[in-house]
Amino acid sequence: MSNTYLTWAKNNMRLNVAEGLHDFIQADCLEWLAQQSSQTYSKRFDLIFLDPPTFSNSKRMQDAFDVQNHHVELIRQAASLLTEQGVLYFSTNFRRFKLDEQHLSDLTITDISKKTVPLDFARTPKIHYCWRITKHA
């Protein structure tokens, strides 16, 4: 939702000669995902990176966002936009985060956190969590 981050992304794409190949959307992520996942013929993605903030109470959002309380809905809606072979990577830096695998049991979830924490932080691995998520085969 931030113009600053959207501008950074556009500049990065331009610098990497990928300008014009991607869409940039400024929206409340929860609203956009709900809208897209409710459409029968919405666009499908081979790869989705989902790295939400731990907490947000942006003026542009209807309600405050809390990753612990909203991650199931967020992951479900994003996963519904995957192609059959698509992969969703979900990550968070919330140190006390607990993934609710029980309510996501229809998805294949692999914890890849150890592979994504830099060696500099190996002594404190709970600074970051990451999962690879796919639809059941």
Cite the ranges covered by each PLM segment.
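S-adenosyl-L-methionine
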Residues: S2-L47
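Mobile active-site "lid"/loop adjacent to the S-adenosyl-L-methionine
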Residues: Y5, Q26, L30, D46-Q77
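Anionic group-transfer/hydrolysis microenvironments
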Residues: S2, P53, N93
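Short amphipathic alpha-helical segments
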Residues: S37-S38, R60-D63, E101-L104
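Conserved protein kinase catalytic core
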Residues: A34, N57, F97
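C-terminal catalytic and target-recognition region of SAM-dependent MTase-like enzymes
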Residues: E73, V87-A137
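Helix-to-beta-strand junctions that scaffold the AdoMet/dcAdoMet cofactor pocket
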Residues: A18, L82-E84
